[in-house]
Amino acid sequence: MFGRESADLAKKYFESLRKKAADKRFARYEGSAASETPSATGPLLRGGHEELNRGCANAARDGFELAAQPEPRRVTGFQFAVDVSQRFQACIPPVGSLHSCCAASCMFAFAASEALYETLVADSLEAARLKVGAEYKNLANDSGASDGEMAPPRPDSMLGGLRGALDELAFAQYSNADAEAHERVYDGVMAGYSDMICSDEFAQLSDFVFRFAALLKTSFKGTTGAGRGAYYVSPGSNKRRRLNRGNSSRNGYRPREGRLELFQKMILMHATYFAACITLDDESTERMDRYLAEVFNTPLFSSPALHHFKQRTSVFLVPRRHGKTWFLVPLISLLVSCFEGLRIGYTAHLRKATKPVFEEIYARLCRWYGEDRVHQIKGETIAFSFKNGARSSIVFASSQNTNVSIRQLLYGVAAKARCGIDDANGRVSELAFYFCSHGAPLNFLLLSAP
């Protein structure tokens, strides 16, 4: 009910700030002293709490007052707040608390989210690079990427004019007593954010993102012996060498980065969102979605669209030799070596079709981490051991009967992977990818929660 009044108040407040900024620029141009208006942060309405609770919009319109103290205590992190009932407030880091119905809240939320999570992506990739340590050297040698190519600087996602306008905003400051309540709310929100990024589960997610980006730099170099599709070129061929091992000192040539097809990016997004959902707790779901939106460059995905994307089943009709196995081998290898307790099932119509995939994944994991942490059981299961004793596994299965139903095939892999399926209500504790090739039987990949 106060949305329109709050929008009017915010508009009047912005106009007053614009006038003061113009006066300050004019005074600076004339050589006079700088304005004594407090330049630190804070908000806008004081003394309007009771009026807004009673619904007296007319009294609230006259509620503008600047802080009277000449040198108030700086409150770190605050940029905006509205003095209204707590149930009407929304805290947006690193902006602060504002009215949830404020017309400008969308602008603040977008700008703050972009700044916060864009920085988080860069910092998390750098932290993952430092954490990997010796394992990073094996990964870098396998991918052919140098140290500086792992996490290149991201371009600024904001327009220059918008960033300049945000930098020029200066808000009135709260007194110490008024700022304490908003500061507690802000600290509570940021505490949840800090707990997420400091958790071991988020470290697993950031490690996976970093490692996949490193391998994508050179089109998954080293994925030989399996999936010899359109993207496969033998390691000794000149074409492969020109693509990934160009000499940067000669004619300014730089190696070309790998590119994903649309269906490959969708598979990657499905697998990453699923692994993040089963790894992080429910309280971190919204923050995790924002983080992955920055990683996959999908900032315009709405919440309903993202929820539908995570819940739906995807069937990919992909022709032969178009990069299915070329992409799945490094994806499975990274999933099983980054996320603890994950169980993966891979099936094909014939055993000879799963054997090269099994051998390549096993060889890749041994090359990255050594044979002590990788174990194969009866030629159909690969178990990966983490340093803390946790395990993840991959189960390979085949079906000679090409007319077998999807449900029967799913039960077969689930039984070997020892993961249950709730048939009564269709609860999704597994994520399955179905791949159909023209004139070929069905293949699919199954990911199961711990």
From Swiss-Prot:
Disulfide bonds: none annotated. It holds the Pfam family DNA_pack_N. GO terms for biological process: chromosome organization. Belongs to the herpesviridae large terminase family. The PsHV-1 may encode two large terminase protein homologs UL15a and UL15b. The terminase function was assigned to UL15a since it shares a stronger sequence homology with the other family members. This is Large terminase protein homolog UL15b. It comes from Psittacid herpesvirus 1 (isolate Amazon parrot/-/97-0001/1997).
